[in-house]
Amino acid sequence: MNWTMKRYDPAPFWNVPHEWPAQTAFIVAGGPSVLQQDLELLRGRNVIAINSSIYAVPWAQFLYFGDYRWWDEEANRNAIERYQGRTVTTSRLVRHPKVMICQKTNPPGLALQCDSLMQRYTSLTAATNLAAHLVGPGGTIVWLGADGKHAADGRTHHHVPHRWYSKPGCYDQQLTDLVTIVPSLKQLRISAFNASPGTAWHELLPAVDLEEMVGKQRAA
């Protein structure tokens, strides 16, 4: 099949529903610290997987990818064909009946329109924006795998590495966008936490233990 690099302009863009009102959304990003987590704790909860994290949590309700290069790999397209949840992107190069496209906005801050997601240097901002639309005021967002660094052994991801390499300074670039969403979350009255052991982004969001966080949700 010829996957032509042709921009697709959907009209209208997909509107994210307010589907998890005042609930907790867990976002599984790609950082190596995910290997230290018991992901079974998330089964049955509100979960968004970012690109290849879908292989670790195939039962997640949402899959978000922002990079066409990820979609361009046949194994990933096949995974989406098998996936039972909903797939969302901001890439206008994608045209597929199982992929919903939102409008991409630039930083600073999260996009407030429910058909838009903010992304520039990292899919984590867009996935957080997706979660914010889903949970709304009074909701909570918890990051996993938001490490902001490589592991001590040089590992870059908890899953099979992407075929493209991380550029020097990429985490600093990502941080410049991530810091701008913190005021947005406060404005939206959404609590956000980072459950990524050893994260380099410890000053961005309060650090929490995943097991304790899930325990609190069960007790609520």
Where do the language-model regions lie?
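Metal-ion/cofactor- or nucleotide/acyl-coenzyme-handling active-site neighborhoods
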Residues: 1-220
